[in-house]
Each structure stands twice: as structure tokens, then as C-alpha cells.
Design a protein with these regions (language model features):
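Long, contiguous secondary-structure blocks with strong helical propensity
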Residues: 17, 81, 118-120
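Amphipathic alpha-helical interaction surfaces in cytosolic regulatory modules
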Residues: 26-104
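Short secondary-structure boundary/capping segments
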Residues: 1, 10-12, 74, 96
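A charged, well-structured terminal subsegment
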Residues: 108-130
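Short, low-complexity, intrinsically disordered N-terminal peptides in bacterial proteins
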Residues: 1-6, 126-130
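STAS-typified acidic loop motif
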Residues: 3-37
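General small-molecule cofactor/ligand-binding pocket signal
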Residues: 12, 85, 107
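Conserved catalytic submotifs in the C-terminal HATPase_c
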Residues: 15-16, 55, 87, 111
Length: 130
């Protein structure tokens, strides 16, 4: 578990190559770097398919949205994926207004996001592209 003054990140691994990162608190200019770092480390360590469980998020600004897009790109570069789950109404509205929900799949719950993850056959065992 990682602590920052405005964010707590909790990780679980429901399956090989998949991680759920629960985000509690506020995603802002101060806490976004911790989220980015933790997500990218999970991907590097062999979980290229990542679900961000946003249900406990109290606040998110443009730094948080930018971080989510950066994580998506990082995951895709490593044959992975990013899904968002459980976004509270204030965050779901922000994702909709900005169009981020068209870039990153969003689901009502982490369980639904996990059910939609497809690990492609023939994907490299390693998470880094050559």
C-alpha cells in the first residue's frame, strides 16, 4: 500500500497478468505522480492488464485525467489494457465531459471490468516490447 497526503493505493492480483489498483482519496497534481508510478510499476512487474477501481475517489482534476491517459498508453505499449471501474458520479461526469470515457473503457464495478479483460493469444510473455 502506498501513502500520499491525498491518496491511498491498494493492489490486488485476481489473475496472472491482471491487477486491480484501488484508488482512495483525491487524484490531483500532488497525488497523480504516485498513481502513475504505482500503475506503471505493476505493468512492468507483469500485470499489463490494469483495472483502476475509482469507487473511493473523492476528487479528480485534470492531472488525474492526464495520468489515466498516460497509464493507458503505457499499458498498450506493453500489449496490455486499462479499464476504469466504479467511478463516482462526479468523476463519471468529468470522464464524460472530457471524452476520456471514449478512450478508456469504464465499468460500474471492478468485477465487471475484470470480466471484460481479454488476454490476447500469442501476446508476448514479457511486458516490454522489443
Amino acid at each position: 500500500m502506498t501513502h500520499n497526503p491525498t491518496i491511498v493505493l491498494t493492489v490486488r492480483h485476481p489473475a496472472d497478468s491482471i491487477a486491480v489498483l484501488e484508488v482512495t482519496g483525491e487524484i490531483d497534481v500532488d497525488s497523480a505522480p504516485a498513481l502513475r508510478s504505482s500503475a506503471m510499476e505493476l505493468i512492468r512487474q507483469g500485470a499489463p492488464h490494469l483495472v483502476l477501481d475509482l469507487a473511493p475517489v473523492e476528487f479528480c482534476d485534470s492531472s488525474g485525467l492526464n495520468t489515466m491517459i498516460g497509464i493507458l498508453r503505457y499499458a498498450k505499449d506493453r500489449y496490455g489494457s486499462l479499464s476504469l471501474a466504479g467511478a463516482p458520479s462526479h468523476l463519471a461526469r468529468l470522464l464524460d465531459i472530457t471524452g476520456v470515457d471514449h478512450l478508456i473503457p469504464t465499468y460500474p464495478t471492478a468485477a465487471e471490468a475484470l470480466a471484460r479483460i481479454v488476454v490476447p493469444e500469442g501476446a508476448p510473455a514479457e511486458t516490454e516490447r522489443p
